[in-house]
């Protein structure tokens, strides 16, 4: 691992070129010719915190699959007349409390939606992605950002850029009423999970008054009163080029790709990145007691919540080591030992950073029946104090630093996991070099750094959480009793497809795995064969053992 720092900064696979298009959209390009595929993503620095408790950021992510004024319709002008009225009716619905009037408005929306569906080509965006070499199409909404991504074949880079930039120019909120049912099902599904409501309650208590206090999907009340006009304003405010990033990792030539990206993604609307006022969380005052209800008899659950740090905080690297002294993937932490020695039923530590705040917490399961919360907490504090007093060996400290560096490097070994890191780092406002430099910061950490960090964050001001057996009232979003919205043009194609078909497909020379050239094959003994390849990304060694026994499935 001594050479890891240099490998992280010099390996061709790990070079990321950062570029800005003429509209200020940021592009990160990572060439990797080890496989004939490209991972492509658009990152928007807008998430649930920018629409707290409304669910708009999440709604909007769903609607981005419904097409544009060119994709997903056979006649947008006629469709738009109906969509505009539907948007007005949703605004009226949100302002109406009378049950009879609400039912009347919802029926009008349903009638209009059924008529508008006559112009819709369902799932055309998804079909276009598949048609031009794309797989694993997906998206996700977090508190801080929204991601749109998929993997595709390199010869279709021009088509991918055209489709995915068109998607962001003028998205159309069609089939909204039927999509509401999907979101309702998501919300109800979360409510069915045993501890989900308790986690929501804790999150609200921990983060209030920050927008992180509210669920990403939004409250049930807000989900029943969506405003398409607010969704449009959300798009206009946050989906501007300067607030977005384009991530590509895979088999392409940077100099050939940049003109393609400029001619497509530079169409996205320019605009200043939105201003945000960051809400600072107040410190806990002493031992703040909180109880939550979970329908799990006999099992005791306890948590200690401290104030963590945001993603860009300089203390994060040292805090990671301090937390790993308590709990780590190798099971060698002080809390891990409590579990192994049967002093508690289970214990783990959490150190998660969002862009504006972080979660630092310990979750403990006291032993069945006779162990009290007080006794379990005393054991946990004893382990915390060991770190604060420097009661850990140099061998353990160096081992955990080495493990941290290995985790950094292993995440960069393949295209998909590397692109995931690129998306996260971009969304946090960091450069790629910032990420690579964190390995240097791990190297520079001393025992004293970790001791001081433990003293700084594991204080006597914390949230003390215990579980009570019980459940919270369940809020069910009922499935609306409307006429089904069934588009009639499932086999149709928009005029936009003709435009895509005229774009030349690049020639791709296939590469087939040749075990004689791409791997060293060594016969160790009869029926024992070693297949060996060089890790050209970093100096991590990995070994997989496959036994030729059992049925072949």
Residue spans for each PLM region:
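Proteolytic maturation boundary segments
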Residues: 1-28, 253-293, 301, 336, ...
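Catalytic Zn2+-binding segment of zinc metalloproteases
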Residues: 62-73
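Short, conserved secondary-structure transition motifs
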Residues: 184-192, 280-294, 401-411
């Amino acid at each position: 691992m001594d050479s890891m720092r240099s490998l992280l900064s010099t390996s061709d696979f790990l070079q990321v070129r950062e570029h800005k298009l003429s509209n200020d959209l940021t592009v990160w390009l990572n060439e990797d010719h080890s496989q004939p595929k490209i991972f492509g993503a658009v990152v928007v620095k807008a998430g649930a915190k920018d629409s707290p408790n409304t669910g708009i950021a999440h709604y909007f992510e769903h609607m981005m699959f419904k097409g544009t004024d060119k994709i997903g319709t056979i006649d947008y002008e006629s469709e738009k007349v109906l969509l505009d009225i539907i948007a007005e009716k949703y605004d009226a619905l949100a302002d109406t409390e009378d049950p009879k009037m609400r039912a009347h408005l919802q029926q009008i929306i349903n009638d209009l939606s059924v008529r508008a569906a006559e112009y819709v080509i369902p799932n055309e965006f998804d079909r276009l992605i598949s048609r031009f070499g794309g797989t694993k199409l997906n998206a996700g909404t977090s508190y801080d950002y929204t991601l749109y991504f998929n993997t595709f074949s390199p010869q279709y880079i021009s088509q991918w850029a055209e489709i995915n930039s068109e998607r962001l120019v003028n998205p159309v909120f069609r089939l909204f009423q039927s999509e509401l049912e999907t979101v309702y099902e998501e919300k109800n599904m979360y409510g069915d999970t045993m501890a989900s409501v308790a986690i929501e309650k804790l999150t609200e208590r921990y983060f209030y008054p920050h927008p992180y206090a509210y669920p990403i999907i939004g409250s049930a009340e807000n989900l029943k009163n969506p405003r398409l006009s607010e969704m449009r304003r959300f798009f206009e405010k946050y989906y501007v080029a300067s607030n977005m990033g384009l991530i590509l990792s895979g088999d392409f030539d940077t100099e050939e790709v940049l003109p393609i990206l400029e001619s497509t993604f530079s169409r996205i609307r320019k605009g200043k990145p939105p201003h945000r006022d960051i809400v600072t969380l107040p410190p806990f005052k002493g031992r703040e007691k909180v109880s939550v209800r979970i329908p799990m008899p006999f099992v005791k659950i306890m948590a200690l919540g401290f104030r963590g740090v945001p993603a860009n905080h300089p203390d994060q690297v040292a805090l990671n080591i301090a937390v790993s002294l308590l709990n780590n993937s190798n099971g060698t932490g002080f809390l891990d030992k409590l579990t192994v020695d049967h002093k508690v039923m289970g214990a783990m530590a959490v150190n998660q950073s969002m862009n504006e705040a972080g979660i630092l917490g310990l979750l403990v399961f006291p032993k069945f029946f006779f162990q009290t919360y007080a006794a379990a907490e005393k054991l946990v504090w004893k382990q915390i104090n060991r770190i604060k007093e420097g009661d850990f060996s140099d061998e353990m400290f160096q081992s955990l630093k080495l493990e941290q560096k290995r985790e950094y490097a292993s995440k960069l070994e393949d295209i998909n996991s590397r692109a995931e890191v690129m998306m996260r780092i971009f969304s946090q406002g960091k450069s790629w070099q910032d990420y690579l430099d964190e390995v240097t910061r791990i190297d520079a950490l001393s025992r004293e750094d970790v001791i001081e960090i433990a003293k700084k964050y594991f204080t006597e001001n914390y949230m003390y959480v215990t579980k009570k057996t019980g459940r919270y009232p369940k809020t069910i979003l009922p499935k609306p009793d409307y006429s089904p919205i069934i588009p009639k043009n499932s086999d149709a194609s928009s005029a936009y497809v003709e435009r895509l078909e005229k774009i030349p497909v690049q020639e791709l020379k296939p590469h087939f795995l040749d075990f004689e050239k791409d791997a060293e094959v060594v016969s160790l003994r009869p029926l024992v064969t070693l297949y060996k390849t060089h890790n050209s990304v970093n100096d991590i060694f990995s070994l997989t053992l496959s036994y030729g026994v059992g049925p072949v499935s």
